[in-house]
Amino acid sequence: MAADEARSVSRLHSEEDMHGKHHSTLWGDFFLHHVPCRPGQYLIMKDNVEIMKEEVKKMLLDVGSSDLSHKLDCIDTLERLGLDYHYTKEIDELMCNVFEARDQDLDLTTTSQLFYLLRKHGYHISSDVFLKFRDDKGDIVTNDARCLLRMYEAAHVRVNGEEILDNILIHTKRQLQCIVDDLEPTLQEEVRYALETPLFRRLNRVQARQFISTYEKSTTRINMLLEFSKLDFNILLTLYCEELKDLTLWWKEFQAQANTTIYARDRMVEMHFWMMGVFFEPQYSYSRKMLTQLFMIVSVLDDLYDSHCTTEEGNAFTAALQRWDEEGVEQCPTYLRTLYTNIRATIKAIEEDLNFQNNKHAKLVKGLIIDMAMCYNAETEWRDKKYVPATVDEHLKISARSSGCMHLVSQGFISMGDVATSEALEWASTYPKIVRAVCIIARLANDIMSYKREASNNTMVSTVQTCAKEYGTTTVEQAIEKIRELIEEAWMDITHECLRQPQPKALLERAVNLARTMDFLYKDADGYTDSRSIKGILDSLYVHLID
């Protein structure tokens, strides 16, 4: 035991460890002192928003008797501005009316918008609605940029086997790329954003922040809606900052007591952003804080098993977590005993909070930590044996689950209280197809961006290496291209499962939001590990109010 501890201490001093390979926090104590607006200003904003909410509700009642195109535009605008969460019932009623009127003789632009919104809201609508627009060669031809954009967005809610949507996606993407530089500035901005991230895959707050600026330039804007969206955005930003103040205090104490700074990434603000991507609404403030705490612990465990502890230490620590008692950690070195104590203290505090809220699922929280530790420990066996799985599917059986997404969905449901039933939690724990698809997107997107770094760190082989082995590709680029195809298939599975609606829409939306968050974080870089790549976005969501 003494020799084991001595070896651990020696390693801490002799290695640069993870802290030397990843940049330090970009935020530090920033949110302990950052106050976006004065309390009086905040109350005035909330009062004004309540007035505007009622005005928009009246507007929606009027829209109910308007033509189909106007209904679609109204819903689309509210969703892009990030205001739709205030009007779930009203929009559901409008979408029901839209579905009943879907057989009208519509032009291609309106048909595309109709198709996109119905699919997004879980309605079954056949892609055959596009057949009538094909020419003699079987192509759908248009030179209208706005129409191309609508078609492009519609094609991104396809499911497997929809050949017409596959073709629409290929052709509209190619055409939009060709004409984007020649479009007028506002439309050009929309097209470039869509080519980077299609509408269905965008994060609510990121999309709202971007579209508010676009909408402000529109000659057809409704000024009250613009002002409403700005105030609502600023109110949520202020709430997020209050949460980050509390979380900063917790994280500073956890780091100091558990001494994780020497090997673990310090990404608490980025983790809050991750959770906010899944639960952005104000009523889920506790969900964001609880999940940020839980998954910061998961992040520490990821780094611990990945690059810091020995195999023997990992085995002992995993066994201790499985026992979950004071005696279980006695065989571990001092630094792991300290970490163990602080993990249990955080979990106990969360359980007490949930019990106080009369949440009957509090006892399930610690299972996240235990299961993630077991996943990470299993991965070290592959690493130590230098084993390369024969197929991507074999790899994903372990690595997709270790992405933590399955656990985030389950723990997210727990944090929602009565919104999630015991049946919903049981369903989530069976690793249903939609959750598996989210996990696959997370794992594959992460591996694409982290492949080079992790290949040089002697960590577990990634799906990139496994894909190259399975398909006999000669270059990393070819393997990555194949992996991108698998990601697209996973998105199609998500759309398909949302159309089946095995669970309430409010719960399915959390899984979709998680996929959107993973898409954002790993689109151009590993945005969690190298959070400098998303610093500008975080500034716009947490620091700067909209004037």
From Swiss-Prot:
Q: Which GO terms describe its cellular component?
A: cytoplasm
Q: Which CDD domains match?
A: Terpene_cyclase_plant_C1
Q: What InterPro entries does the database record attribute to this sequence?
A: Isoprenoid_synthase_dom_sf, Terpene_cyclase-like_1_C, Terpene_cyclase_plant_C1, Terpene_synth_N, Terpene_synth_N_sf, Terpene_synthase-like, Terpene_synthase_metal-bd, Terpenoid_cyclase/PrenylTrfase
What residues does Mg(2+) 3 bind to?
446, 454
Q: How is the cofactor bound?
A: Binds 3 Mg(2+) or Mn(2+) ions per subunit.
Does the keyword Manganese belong to this entry?
Answer: yes
Cofactor(s) demanded: Mg(2+); Mn(2+)
Motif extent (DDXXD motif): 302-306
Q: What induces it?
A: Induced by Diabrotica virgifera damage in roots and Spodoptera littoralis damage in leaves. Accumulates upon stemborer Chilo partellus eggs deposition in some cultivars (e.g. cv. Braz1006) but less in others (e.g. cv. Delprim and cv. B73).
- Which processes are annotated in GO (biological process)? beta-caryophyllene biosynthetic process; defense response to insect; diterpenoid biosynthetic process; farnesyl diphosphate catabolic process; response to herbivore; response to insect; sesquiterpene biosynthetic process; terpenoid biosynthetic process
Q: Which UniProt keywords apply?
A: Cytoplasm, Lyase, Magnesium, Manganese, Metal-binding, Plant defense
User: What GO MF annotations does this protein's record show?
Assistant: (-)-E-beta-caryophyllene synthase activity; magnesium ion binding; terpene synthase activity
- One Pfam family in the UniProt entry: Terpene_synth_C
Annotated binding of Mg(2+) 1, by residue: 302, 306
Which residues are substrate-binding?
Answer: 302, 306, 443, 446
Activity at various pH: Optimum pH is 8-9.5.
**Subunit structure comment from the entry:** Monomer.
The written remark on domains in the entry is: The Asp-Asp-Xaa-Xaa-Asp/Glu (DDXXD/E) motif is important for the catalytic activity, presumably through binding to Mg(2+).
Name recorded for this polypeptide: (E)-beta-caryophyllene synthase
Q: Which organism is it from?
A: Zea mays (Maize)
Question: Which gene specifies this protein's sequence?
Answer: TPS23
